[in-house]
Amino acid sequence: MIRPLPPELRGLLARGEVLLSVKDAVRELLENALDAGARRVRVELWGGGLERIVVEDDGEGIPLEELPLAVEPFATSKLQDLERIATLGFRGQALYALRQAATLKIRSRPRGQVGGGLLLARGERVELRPAPAPPGTRVEVLGLFAGEGRDPKAEARGVLDLLKRYLLHHPHLSLVLFLEGEARLLFPGAGLKEAARQAFGGLLAERLFPLEKGGAFALEGLLTGPQVSRTRPDLLFLAVNGRPVALPEGVLRAVRRAYRELLPEGHYPVGVLNLSLPPGAYRLRLDARKEEVALSKEAEAFLEEALEEAFRGQNLARALPEPRPLPALRPPPLPACPPCATWATFRESYLLAEAEDAVYIVDQHAAHERILFEELLARLREEGLKPLPYPVLVELDEEPPEASPLFGIEGFGPGRVRLLSAPPFLHPYPLLPPEIFRESLKGEGRSRLRGLLARLACLPALKAGHPLARAEGQALLDALLACETPWVCPHGRPVLLHLKEEDLIRRFGRRSGARAKEEPHPHPPRETTREGS
């Protein structure tokens, strides 16, 4: 039932503008439809939405006697408790704002009601009369932002982008968009993968792998692996309980940690994360945008764990061992890349290779680092710590720790510690353990262990400019492809670049690949812009 909000809630919610664009108007009406349980929504824009907006749904509808209250300020059926907001809309402001800025027509009928109602509203004038209507609600907005000289094409583009975003978070919604009477978006509610095709395009959608983890905290989504990334998280979309929201720093932090072995530092995946969280696991800012959230530490930890589980399921990464106790060595999963054949080197620093329908460019130093890093990691898991031939005394400028990820230690007075055991690969180098131990005091936990192993792998790795015979290059490539995470070096830099044949076809403006045998002769070149070249 629609009812006015009490004064104390009005004060908390009366912040910010509701309508700044046609996109804002469509978003508010679409959220009303979703909150009403709609399974099908039709959106029409005329003049980019500046002349007329139509949003029609098959939701539960509004009873005739409640229609006038629906366009009053701070009137809503959705908000009971600010701590337990379960709907997309809750402020009770959108229809009132539309009534003040444009002419508003609402035709609605609940399924159990005989006959519907038609409400006409503009400013302070409100007219209600019975009228035939199918089950659901149809809202028309006429003359929004009249006289402001807005660009209809820009407004329509904003709405199209908005609807594609909502499909990522409501992939079973049947949604159509008509621009000037022509169908621009037709989505039958075919699921998340098809929604991703609409939002990202078919080529990128094929490179997304699924995420799914259930429970009180749940995650569904799609993400790219190491082959695709961006230097900004502008194509990474988040929803909490169906609400599209901006990425809070806590989520970005969890994603960066989960991808730390897969992507270069400062890079982000492409995809969508749909989180379902219980009350208390997140906090929503109560402004007009309704898109800023803060997640609890528990929710952030759940997200990171869910991502890492998905990566292991895709053979993309494995977790580093906990410092103590060391887990047993497990058989490695299948290689993350298909077999490659090296056929050239460039400037004695890069290997050029091909595999199936792709070309790979491999940084030989970063590749050797990754190989050595995983060898050290495997030996640490398999061999653990072994007693040193004799204890090594180390003097420190700080209080010694109680434990170390790479050494067995015991205190030996103020600022002094004895190293009793170490990984076997350090035993032949008696001068290294004290230096490595001091280095191990920087950082914490797994990141500290990773940094130490990365440093140990970097020292003996092949350097740029070191010539390799073809057989040596092939051996290096084979060893890299046997790694569990061949995409980045231990420091987070890329190891290889990956170009699929379809990428080359698109860049060169061809119609098909060499294997397709569809064109007996090359077609003549065509003029291209920089963007299309």
UniProtKB/Swiss-Prot annotation:
InterPro entries attached to this UniProt entry: DNA_mismatch_repair_MutL, DNA_mismatch_S5_2-like, HATPase_C_sf, MutL/Mlh/PMS, MutL/Mlh/Pms-like, MutL_C, MutL_C_dimsub, MutL_C_regsub
Sequence ranges of Basic and acidic residues compositional bias: 515-533
Top-rank taxon: Bacteria
Biological processes per GO annotation: mismatch repair
GO molecular-function terms, A-Z: ATP binding; ATP hydrolysis activity; ATP-dependent DNA damage sensor activity; mismatched DNA binding
Keywords: DNA damage, DNA repair
Any one cellular-component term (Gene Ontology): mismatch repair complex
Annotated region (Disordered), positions in chain: 510-533
Job description of the protein: This protein is involved in the repair of mismatches in DNA. It is required for dam-dependent methyl-directed DNA mismatch repair. May act as a 'molecular matchmaker', a protein that promotes the formation of a stable complex between two or more DNA-binding proteins in an ATP-dependent manner without itself being part of a final effector complex.
Entries under HAMAP family matching the protein: DNA_mis_repair
UniProt similarity note: Belongs to the DNA mismatch repair MutL/HexB family.
Protein's name in the database: DNA mismatch repair protein MutL
Organism of derivation: Thermus aquaticus
Species classification: Bacteria, Thermotogati, Deinococcota, Deinococci, Thermales
